[in-house]
Amino acid sequence: MHHSGKGAALVLGIGNILWADEGFGVRAVEALHQAYEFPAEVKLMDGGTQGLYLLPLVQDADILVIFDAIDYGLPAGTLKVVDDHDVPSYLGVKKMSLHQTGFQEVLALSAITGRYPAKVRLIGVQPLDLDTYGGSLTEPVRSQMEPSLAVAIRFLMEQGFPSRRRISGCVPESLCPPSVNLAHYEAGILVGGR
């Protein structure tokens, strides 16, 4: 599979899976990776809470897609899409965790250095629960997983990066360690531990 556009795309899931809905971004990019194949120029990444460590990756991207739990002040589970230079202001609306401050800085430094992606899309979902340590995604947030993936797929296609559903049984290596795989995490299965 190849793309007809130029450059490279980075699809980032940011957030902290240990705090319930705060893990939406990471869970979304992992679900996208498990279900779809993209051209080699598309990098899917669990950005977690890495903050400034993501700067070189963002600077090298022509197209940036971000999945994150964002407190828009809307009903829980509301899916909201924000584009381009409006993205940093939405990441700073109401900070829910330190990763949002760190990622705002990544975008600001990318702009200051003149290496800001040509197109940026934030796919955010209003969280319900950010206080349950060890909690998983709540139903209102989980219900927006497929619609959020569809938004990303359509956007990437519009930018010249087509996707293809993975063939059943052809599951790629996970973006995150097996111990934090959503199914294992929710079942309390410790992979590789004692």
Where would I find each of the regions flagged by the language model?
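Active-site and ligand/interface coordination hotspots across diverse enzymes
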Residues: M1-A8, A183-R194
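Helix-loop-strand module that forms the ligand-binding subsite of alpha/beta enzymes
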Residues: A69-V120
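Conserved active-site and cofactor/substrate-binding residues in soluble primary-metabolism enzymes
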Residues: G23, R27, T49, L74, ...
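Residue-level signal for pocket-adjacent positions within structured domains
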Residues: G13, L74-G77, V93, V125, ...
